[in-house]
Amino acid sequence: MSTEAKCPFNHTAAGGTSNKDWWPNQLNLNILHRHSALSDPMDKDFDYAQAFKKLDLAAVKRDLQALMTTSQDWWPADFGHYGGLFVRMAWHSAGTYRIADGRGGAGGGQQRFAPLNSWPDNANLDKARRLLWPIKQKYGRNISWADLLILTGNVALESMGFKTFGYAGGRADTWEPDDVYWGSEKIWLELSGGPNSRYSGDRDLENPLAAVQMGLIYVNPEGPDGNPDPVAAARDIRDTFARMAMNDEETVALIAGGHTFGKTHGAGPATDVGPEPEAAGIELQGLGWKSAYASGKGHDAITSGLEVTWTSTPTKWSHDFFKHLFSYEWELTKSPAGAHQWVAKGADEVIPDAFDASKKHRPTMLTTDLSLRFDPAYEKISRRFYENPAEFADAFARAWFKLTHRDMGPRARYLGPEVPAEELLWQDPIPAVDHPLIDDADVAALKAKVLASGLSVAQLVSTAWASASTFRGSDKRGGANGARIRLAPQKDWEVNQPAALAAVLETLEGVRKAFNDAQTGGKKVSLADLIVLAGAAGVEQAAKSAGVAVTVPFAPGRMDASQEQTDVDAMAVLEPVADGFRNYLKSAYKTPAEALLVDKAQLLTLNGPELTVLVGGLRVLGANVGDAKHGVFTDRPGTLSNDFFVNLLDMGTEWKPVSAANDVFEGRDRATGQVKWTGTRVDLIFGSHSQLRALAEVYGSADANEKFVRDFVAAWNKVMNLDRFDLA
């Protein structure tokens, strides 16, 4: 008999076989319940924005300045200055951002959690965050980790003589990892062409991914799959940086600006490096990559395996990067760790050693650095920056600010004394309110006008939904404020039914103009407000038809953006490829429609009950694209009833697929065989998936009609106001 002690508790945090193990294709609703109050240690009334406003930012920056040159024996500073390390830390915090779904980025301080804290590309950034702990500890809840990581990058640049564009706080911390799709590979840094490759065809990178390998922020610095070809690497750079919303000029500025500072680390073989933080021993207290090579730190540090210092002044802003890039010819060599890198042919030893003042080295570059010279488009920009140092400095300052603030959303979220005054197009600017707002009496009068305009409940509801549901909680973009639904590109999106939308907007514009023309004292209603108000009127009318009197909350204050304030290309990524709330799929996808619905719900910050009640309500209100009848399980469309759930759960109906792709179904009467309803996967999932069925049963019960209306109104109002950061 074994003498090994047996744990009496089988249900420990280490876990047993999970539902995901048994049913790997089961629809995952967990992403809808991340970051709840249950994981947040702060008091219920804690307001981070108010806490940050009380922060002495100048004092924090003084402490950070002092930290830069206070080298610690347990992780010594290169060149006696931590600036390069902290620039990399901030860059990698923000650099996970991707435009396709707005996920990633610096908001929330996700670099603290798995998997990001253990990505190979984030090696030894655990040390950077530990260096910051005394400062975070000192200022506590008044500055989040998310804000501190970016602020530290800014201060690092400033301490090395660079003038930054500005800094905004306002990133509240999260307390658990995001549930983000980073790829399907099972091995860190797995090369393309494998069974789980993120590439297909002619090196087409899977959407929404924005890095070339699992565990990298952008590209492989040695070149594609480690092939040291600067021209081929340029293709990867252009693709990945574009997926982070950067154009060629911003890309060149970021690479050259960032690589003006610090160095890479590859003193010895990767086999001497221990496991990443999440796999390291408990005694290491959350640190990873413990190295057995010599001292394992300082001169002996191993991070990327590359051993490159770009400039002769790695702790000062300079023009050396471009000077070296264009002044030398480059020959391929290998780092002490065996990684591909380049050294200046026949050059003098002008590069200082990071730890030995008596030593000098020849200039070195990464394969991806040389892309800025050997790619024709990048070369033109690089040479212009080389010849115009002030232009380069301005471009880097602006690109750095964009990199570190892109996922913060509108300027209304920016906090602190260093917020730049200049309004930037990528911030999706909206005019400030410049007139008296409508009051409750005006709201009632406008609702009456809208309901008398000839527009149907379905038209009012679908237009308001189309306007507001572009919002993404990931990067805080989109939403009803700005009324960009009337502008390119949104007005032309297939999901918005352009011809029908134009007719609705024309009618609402008539109501708006008549109201505004009749006012004295400058009072106005914006079209952005009126679209949402009209949707509220439609919901109230539909609830009344169901026998429930309800008032949909409404807060005026939205403004109308102009076409000139709208970056058409940047706005295009908000176009839904699927909107299960409107039973819409742009085309066939490998991902099941129900999974796309849950993804959309997560971007709208909805939980399971909110998702459920909104789908059921929007179906009976007739919000489907193209007036499709799939999922309209009611004989009284336009009435806010719980009929969707009642009829979906009716065991008198038998469902069968009627399409080859199993994405359209007929529901027939079990007794007569007569077709009663048609539905999609997005409809039937509420009867098939055990958790969603449990929610559907709540709303399909005999006593649920009033609760259903009340819950629908609450969820509807939430979506309508997701972008109202001015109300917070």
Curated annotation (Swiss-Prot):
PTM entry text: Formation of the three residue Trp-Tyr-Met cross-link is important for the catalase, but not the peroxidase activity of the enzyme.
The question of whether Heme is a record keyword is answered with yes
Q: Which residues bind heme b?
A: 259
Q: What does the UniProt record say this protein does?
A: Bifunctional enzyme with both catalase and broad-spectrum peroxidase activity.
Q: Name one GO molecular function term.
A: heme binding
- Tell me which EC number(s) this protein carries: 1.11.1.21
The residues that cross the membrane are none
Q: Which reaction does it catalyse?
A: H2O2 + AH2 = A + 2 H2O; 2 H2O2 = O2 + 2 H2O
Q: How is the cofactor bound?
A: Binds 1 heme b (iron(II)-protoporphyrin IX) group per dimer.
Residues flagged as site, Transition state stabilizer: 88
Q: Where is the active site?
A: 92 (proton acceptor)
Put simply, this protein is called: Catalase-peroxidase 1
Question: What is the species of this protein?
Answer: Burkholderia ambifaria (strain ATCC BAA-244 / DSM 16087 / CCUG 44356 / LMG 19182 / AMMD) (Burkholderia cepacia (strain AMMD))
Q: Whom does it interact with, and what assembly results?
A: Homodimer or homotetramer.
Q: Which PANTHER family match?
A: CATALASE-PEROXIDASE, HYDROPEROXIDASE I, BIFUNCTIONAL CATALASE-PEROXIDASE
The record's comment on protein family reads:
Belongs to the peroxidase family. Peroxidase/catalase subfamily.
Cross-link Tryptophyl-tyrosyl-methioninium (Tyr-Met) (with W-91), sequence positions: 218-244
Crosslinked residue numbers (Tryptophyl-tyrosyl-methioninium (Trp-Tyr) (with M-244)): 91-218
